[in-house]
Amino acid sequence: MRIEQTLNVTDAFTRTLVTFPSDGLTIYGFMDVPRGEGPFPVVLVLHGYVDPATYNTLTYTTRYADALARAGYLVIHPNFRNWPPSDNGPEEYRVGQAVDVLNLIGLVKKQGGQPGPLQQADPEHLGIWGHSMGGGISQRVITVSDGVDAAVLYGAMSGDEALNHQRILYFTNGVSGLWDEAPPDDVLQRISPINYLDRVTAAVSIHHGDQDATVPPAWSDDLCQRLQALAKPVECFSYPGQPHTFTGDGDQLFIQRVREFFDRELKAS
């Protein structure tokens, strides 16, 4: 990882623009490092879909990253490939973005606690937080990696790629989906994280607004029930009156619950 520039210094943390390599691509993002000696548990904050033409590194999820930094977490917020100024690269089924996260996890595990940008990172305590598209990417990550201790899924896309494809077609009036030509059903089943939940080792915290008109709340309900049936450590919350991105008191309650979840899973051990 490389620090490109300092973006902001607050009373609680320092925010820097960072880059890291991922399969030959350069991925940008920001990192919030709390004041103090550390080591600090690490949380990767994964943003939802924003039109790349209007995307800014300090996007809407910055407030969630900052709240975690103020609570004593070293937060890394990657832009993902194909979101500027990161390089462009393959992303079919959004596997490419999951690869970026997996490479970032590997980097934290290798460089955390060592001299350099991640010296204050605790590589043994790592969580991920994903909203919408980022929540879908998080599901893929926790089904293939045991390097994540805790995962927050917030208004998350489905682990069933057929459902995601249909939803994206709906939003784009049939212009685009996750693929141009539908893969065979057996391939679709193999690439869908929903079919590999038995591999999840992370504790999971699911949050969804019951007035979400973007991602159906039923998708989170289904995921919650599947994880419970597998006896996985999971907690599930529905937020009355809240849309896809929370506001007001519901947003503050969500931030509080996330902090308590990560404190329990990443700081107590």
List each model region and its residues.
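Short beta-strand/loop motif that positions the catalytic acidic residue
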Residues: 200, 206-208, 212
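Mobile cap/lid helix-loop segments that gate and shape the active-site cleft of serine hydrolases
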Residues: 54-55, 149, 156-196, 202
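N-terminal cap/lid segment of alpha/beta-hydrolase-fold proteins
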Residues: 1-37
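Alpha/beta-hydrolase fold nucleophile elbow
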Residues: 117-132
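Short substrate-entry loop that stabilizes the transition state in hydrolases
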Residues: 38-40, 45-87, 160-161
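Short glycine-enriched nucleophile-adjacent loop
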Residues: 106, 135-146
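Alpha/beta-hydrolase active-site loop
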Residues: 92-116
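C-terminal catalytic histidine-bearing segment of alpha/beta-hydrolase fold enzymes
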Residues: 221, 228-269
